[in-house]
């Protein structure tokens, strides 16, 4: 009796066309390293195999230290910056970001010292801020511009090396100033939040300045729309357990909701 082996059949077909597992790994790594990142669907089409097989390949390659897995794909371990230009990000999920920023305005009070990161959601927060006596500390040039016509708001700029991509200041000078300030609360966003409660950033420059701002703050508030959930990026910024409140626009997954409840993290929709 002939027993059909799907595994043997697949291996024979791949070998016949020169696309065995090793060659497939090479194809996957070459494409991801060239593009910086790739989705599971994209890789499945290029390798002409199932999405499930690609997921297994990516998990195996991550264990070998050859790439980083993300939700729905993978990124190159040679990549140092996965961030998008600010002028692109400001229009993505703009309605949701404005909604979240408006809800976070309840945090404001007179004479507060407020830290604002260089995220597009913080930029919406800066635009919506009423002109009340307070101080804003920021590394974002666009936050400065948003506040320039609000005379009651004093703005402290971190200085540092200017990034035209992010329209913000970074580096040792920025971090040096933040280490010497006392901030009542900071507003920041991120590139992703996974179901284990880890908060991710697209590059070390952003992550490092945000960490220093959070360390200088009595309270830290995360503003993140639904597109950030179940998603990783390049650099782990911190954990949700380190923040006080999460402002968002959608319900959390059961896993993430349980994490927030366990760690007493308030979630505001």
Identify the meaning behind each predicted range.
Residues 120, 141-142, 251:
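Alpha-helix/helix-capping structural signal
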Residues 4, 13, 17-20, 30, ...:
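Conserved phosphate- and dinucleotide-binding cores of soluble alpha/beta proteins
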Residues 70-71, 138, 157, 269:
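A generic structural-conservation signal
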Residues 2-4, 8-27, 31-47, 52-118, ...:
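HTH-adjacent hinge/linker in prokaryotic transcriptional regulators
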Residues 27, 56, 99, 124, ...:
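Short Gly/charged-rich anion-binding patches and loops
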